[in-house]
Structure formats: C-alpha cells, structure tokens
C-alpha cells in the first residue's frame, strides 16, 4: 500500500492535485483542510496517503498530516460513511473541531456538513465518542501551526469563484447551494482556496 508520496506539485484543482514522483503523475483527492497547506505549483511537497480500491476505480486520498489520515480511516470504518463523505467532513472541520464536536455531542454542527443527516451524525457520535481522549496529551492530535494560504494562479478560463463552486460541488454540495455559498463570501481579492475556506466556515 502507498502510505506516503513526496514529489513536485504539478496541478492544483480543489479538491484534486497532480503530484509528480520521479516522472510518474499521481492524482490525489485532498480534504480542504489539507489543501490549504499545499505549497505553490512547481514546488516539492509531501502527502500521507490512503488508497481506496473499488470495482470501478482505485482512488488515492492525500493528507498533510498523519492525524488527518488517521481520522479519515476512522471515519470510513463508520457504518454509512464512505470516502467521499469522509472527505467532506474533513474539509468542513479540522481534526480538533471534529473531535470536540463529537466529544461534546454537538449534533447541530455535524448535520451542517453536506451528506451528513441526523442519523449519520448520531451514528458518528455513538461510534467515535471516546476515541479522542488523547487530545489532552501534547503528543497526540497536535494541531498544525497556522499556515498562510498561498496565492495560486487561476485556470485560464475559470475564475476563482468558478473553481470554488466546482470544489464545493465535488465535496457534496448541490450546484445552486455551492454558488450561493461562494457568492456570500465573494471578494475580488480572494483566491479560490480562500473562497472555499470562507464558504465552508460560513456554512458552519
């Protein structure tokens, strides 16, 4: 199994990236919480990975930290939570935010995530509550330091708003809802990544 990749970042199109590792291009899907930590295209980066094998495709998911990957693996063990929904959850909340929502049984926060209904949220509470007690330990689930989101070059024909809407749709939001979310936080000076971050923050 591929557990880690290090190479040159060739393309960034939220939530996907293309990573060149010794001449081989790997397509990876990243939660937005990891996407925000990526360097500019053309630079070296390292991602921790998890491979999902399906009948119709092999999907490679990438994460900026092992902690993010650990939570992803815990999520997909939960009944009714597949990789796509796990990606949406990790895009909407950081590991700490999700852990606290679970430990405090904040059902109202969980159901705001696209694809998470009341039953799924309740199942997450039942199956994951108590698994985050290590948060009190300094060497477990340590929050990554704040990283400024780098500016990125927009695609030739797509505006940052278009890219942000497309990314939100890929994360499970319906197109009209995604467009409304982006419009609400739109600012001419924001990159697509910043728009996505603000839209997800406002949704919660």
Swiss-Prot record:
Any single GO CC term annotated in Swiss-Prot or TrEMBL for this entry: cytoplasm
Extract the ranges annotated as region (Domain III): 156-204
**Positions of region (Domain II):** 65-143
Q: Write down the SUPFAM superfamilies for this protein, in alphabetical order.
A: DNA helicase RuvA subunit, C-terminal domain, Nucleic acid-binding proteins, RuvA domain 2-like
Q: Which family does it belong to?
A: Belongs to the RuvA family.
Function text: The RuvA-RuvB-RuvC complex processes Holliday junction (HJ) DNA during genetic recombination and DNA repair, while the RuvA-RuvB complex plays an important role in the rescue of blocked DNA replication forks via replication fork reversal (RFR). RuvA specifically binds to HJ cruciform DNA, conferring on it an open structure. The RuvB hexamer acts as an ATP-dependent pump, pulling dsDNA into and through the RuvAB complex. HJ branch migration allows RuvC to scan DNA until it finds its consensus sequence, where it cleaves and resolves the cruciform DNA.
Region listing for Flexible linker, in residue ranges: 144-155
Entry's Gene Ontology molecular function annotations: ATP binding; four-way junction DNA binding; four-way junction helicase activity
Annotated protein name in UniProt:
Holliday junction branch migration complex subunit RuvA
Asked if Thylakoid is a keyword of the record, the answer is: no
Q: GO terms for biological process?
A: DNA recombination; DNA repair
**UniProt-listed SMART domains:** HhH1 (SM00278)
What keywords are annotated for this sequence in UniProt? Cytoplasm, DNA damage, DNA recombination, DNA repair, DNA-binding
A Pfam family recorded for this sequence: RuvA_N
Broad class of the protein's primary localization = cytoplasm
InterPro entries recorded for this chain?
DNA_helicase_Holl-junc_RuvA_I, Hlx-hairpin-Hlx_DNA-bd_motif, NA-bd_OB-fold, RuvA, RuvA_2-like, RuvA_C, RuvA_C_sf
Q: How does it assemble?
A: Homotetramer. Forms an RuvA(8)-RuvB(12)-Holliday junction (HJ) complex. HJ DNA is sandwiched between 2 RuvA tetramers; dsDNA enters through RuvA and exits via RuvB. An RuvB hexamer assembles on each DNA strand where it exits the tetramer. Each RuvB hexamer is contacted by two RuvA subunits (via domain III) on 2 adjacent RuvB subunits; this complex drives branch migration. In the full resolvosome a probable DNA-RuvA(4)-RuvB(12)-RuvC(2) complex forms which resolves the HJ.
The listed locations are: Cytoplasm
Task: Outline the segment boundaries, as ranges, of region: Domain I.
Answer: 1-64
What information about domains appears in the record's comments? Has three domains with a flexible linker between the domains II and III and assumes an 'L' shape. Domain III is highly mobile and contacts RuvB.
Keyword DNA damage on this protein? yes
């Amino acid at each position: 199994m591929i557990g880690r990749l290090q190479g040159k970042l060739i393309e960034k199109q939220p939530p996907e990236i293309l990573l060149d590792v010794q001449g081989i291009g790997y397509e990876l899907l990243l939660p937005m919480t990891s996407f925000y930590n990526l360097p500019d295209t053309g630079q070296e980066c390292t991602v921790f990975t998890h491979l999902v094998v399906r009948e119709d495709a092999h999907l490679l998911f990438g994460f900026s930290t092992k902690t993010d990957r650990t939570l992803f693996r815990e999520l997909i063990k939960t009944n009714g939570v597949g990789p796509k929904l796990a990606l949406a959850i990790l895009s909407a909340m950081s590991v700490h935010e999700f852990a606290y929502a679970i430990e405090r049984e904040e059902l109202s926060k969980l159901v705001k995530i696209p694809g998470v209904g009341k039953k799924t949220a309740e199942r997450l509470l039942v199956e994951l509550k108590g698994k985050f007690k290590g948060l009190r330990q300094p060497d477990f689930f340590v929050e990554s330091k704040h990283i400024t989101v780098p500016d990125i070059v927009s695609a030739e024909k797509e505006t940052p708003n278009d890219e942000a809407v497309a990314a939100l749709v890929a994360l499970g939001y319906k197109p009209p809802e995604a467009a409304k979310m982006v419009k609400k936080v739109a600012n001419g000076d924001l990159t697509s990544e910043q728009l996505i971050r603000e839209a997800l923050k406002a949704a919660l």
